A protein has these predicted regions:
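Bacterial N-terminal signal peptides
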Residues: 1-5
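Extracellular glycan-targeting catalytic surfaces
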Residues: 7-171, 206, 226, 248-251, ...
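Hydrophobic/aromatic side-chain positions at a characteristic register within alpha-helices
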Residues: 91-94, 189-193
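Secondary-structure capping and boundary motifs in well-ordered enzyme cores
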Residues: 124, 177, 231-238, 263
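Extended amphipathic alpha-helical interaction segments
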Residues: 155-181, 188, 194-195, 204-212
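Active-site-adjacent structural elements in folded domains
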Residues: 164-173, 213-231
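Pro/Thr/Ser/Gly-rich low-complexity, intrinsically disordered linker/stalk tracts
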Residues: 365-392
Length: 392
């Protein structure tokens, strides 16, 4: 059982409080103003992206989009990047055209989208929804000129069009589907000031029955992950999205990063170590669905997959900066990947840009900004000894 502090319901949420706090924005601004160093290099990665331009040409909105079958998928993916990256450009530079572009995209999609669909709809909503919500959070809480009525319409869109697809996670699937859902549900909860939804996501993160909860994503204390046997790009997708949820939780005073002896870090270290060419321990594992792993229907998942070994997605900077710089916890293999890939870019699946948004020049151990309050994620179970309460 781990312990995590959270504010009481009456205290509300910190805003902006998803991937970026006011302190984070100030740190980015200062790093860019210096004109050199890692943050500046990360900013150049943002600037050169076509999705960061104030004259980005919106491809949507649409009434429905989804995956498998792909329906207007490119429109949603590209406009999600356009909204988030223009919102980030605005927050850092203060240039109004970027704010106006992000607002244009957010308002257009909020006014038209009715459904996220498809067999892979959980992934669709979880991956792109996270970018849309982060864009909305930045714009709403940085004096960008977005009216409260417009923000409320966006709230309704997140609740009515995006959330239903991810509401029940994906018990039947590999873990990356659920971590996609987890990060976006948590982000929607904060943006909409929905304490009940936030609490539900915290409970699922540590007690959920599917492959995307922390103990079922990182399945052994060694750091071996549920999708280690599938492909290295899939395992990176799963743990990378999990840190999206962990960062949102941290901003709100909940330390999922540290849960169960830094289990999320162990997953990243194991994956990074294997990716850079070193040996890691392996044990057979059957996943929560009974389909993937030793003894399952897809029982060819019986060894570490070499697929995509040595290819790294833009996921390592955020957890490395948290553990090594915020908390002073060693993360040597993640650090080697970060040095190899810096400055971190972005992708359609991953929000990325971690060198810009999370780099810290030195160790400065910190705690969540929120003052500790009541326990979060409370679960009651009946045992032979009586009722047992656990929380995070």
């Amino acid at each position: 059982m781990g312990f995590v502090a959270i504010c009481s319901a009456s205290e509300g949420f910190i805003h902006p409080g998803l991937l970026h706090s006011r302190e984070d924005i100030a740190r980015m601004k200062a790093g860019v103003a210096r004109g050199d160093g890692a943050i500046h290099d990360g900013f150049e990665m943002l600037v050169k992206s076509p999705y960061s331009k104030a004259d980005y040409r919106m491809r949507g909105p649409v009434e429905e989009w989804g995956r498998a079958p792909n329906i207007n998928t490119g429109q949603a993916q590209e406009d999600a990047m356009g909204a988030y990256q223009n919102a980030l450009m605005w927050a850092i530079t203060g240039r109004k055209p970027h704010a106006a572009k992000a607002i244009e995209i957010l308002n257009a999609w909020a006014g038209r989208l009715k459904k996220v669909s498809g067999i892979d709809g959980v992934l669709a909503s979880g991956l792109q929804g996270f970018k849309f919500v982060n864009a909305a959070e930045l714009i709403r809480h940085t004096d960008a000129g977005w009216t409260e009525a417009e923000a409320r319409r966006c709230e309704a869109s997140f609740k009515n069009a995006w959330l239903p697809t991810i509401e029940h996670y994906a018990y039947f699937a590999n873990g990356n589907w659920e971590t996609a859902a987890l990060q976006t549900k948590m982000a929607i909860a904060v943006f909409c000031n929905d304490r009940e939804l936030f609490e539900e996501t915290v409970r699922y993160a540590v007690n959920g029955c599917g492959n995307g909860s922390i103990p079922h994503m990182i399945v052994y204390p060694t750091g071996q992950c549920q999708e280690t046997t599938r492909a290295q790009h899939y395992v990176q997708l799963g743990i990378g999205l999990l840190t999206g949820a962990a960062e949102v939780a941290w901003q709100q005073g909940v330390d999922l990063y540290g849960w169960n002896d830094n289990l999320i870090l162990k997953g990243h270290e194991y994956t990074a170590k294997y990716g850079i060419g070193e040996d890691v321990p392996y044990r057979h594992y059957l996943d929560r669905t009974g389909k993937y792993g030793f003894g399952g229907r897809n029982n060819y998942y019986t060894k570490i997959s070499t697929a995509s070994r040595g290819n790294f997605w833009p996921i390592f900077e955020r957890p490395y900066q948290h553990y090594a710089k915020r908390r002073g916890v060693a993360a040597p293999y993640s650090g080697r990947v970060v040095e190899q890939k810096r400055p971190e870019g972005q992708s359609r699946d991953h929000i990325g840009l971690g060198t810009l948004t999370h780099y810290r020049p030195r160790i400065a151990a910190t705690k969540p900004a929120r003052v500790p309050g009541v326990p979060s994620g409370l679960v009651a179970r009946t045992t032979e000894e009586g009722i047992r309460l656990t929380w995070v």
